[in-house]
Amino acid sequence: MSSKLIRPYLVRLAGVKIGKRVHIGANVTFDTIEPRLIQIGNDVTITMNCVLLMHYLKTHENGVIEWHRGKLTIGNNVFIGANTVITKPIMIGDNVIIAAGSVVTKDIPSNCLVGGYPRKSLDFLKLKRASKTFV
């Protein structure tokens, strides 16, 4: 069995909900605290060395540290560039491209190109119809 098939299979076994035609690159790290809270749509490519988390810590002025968690949802026809870090529970819409090396801390609407640290909307994609192959 090729690594293209093994990675999604193993991630599904851990509890992540994965759609069809999903490619997971080498060294992609998924949050292991509650993988069932991660949902990945169809036709998604997550390239190498990405980190997907759905928990974070929030500090207050009085020194109290709160631990938060939530659902991480990745829509259909999404491309996540190499070395991207998703640091909070967020929703990524359909037809989204996230540039390599981005840090994503907020929801991303559909039909959008984002990149940077922290991520910034670079452009709204003018897609009439999503193709079967994104890359």
State what each model feature region is:
Residues 60-66:
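Flexible, solvent-exposed loop segments that connect beta-strands
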Residues 14, 20, 25-26, 31, ...:
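Left-handed beta-helix
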Residues 1-15, 21, 43, 56, ...:
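Terminal amphipathic alpha-helical/low-complexity segments used for targeting or macromolecular assembly
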Residues 32, 54, 60, 122:
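Glycine/Thr-rich phosphate-binding loops of Rossmann-like dinucleotide-binding domains
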Residues 61, 112-113, 127-130:
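Short, glycine/charged-enriched secondary-structure capping and boundary segments
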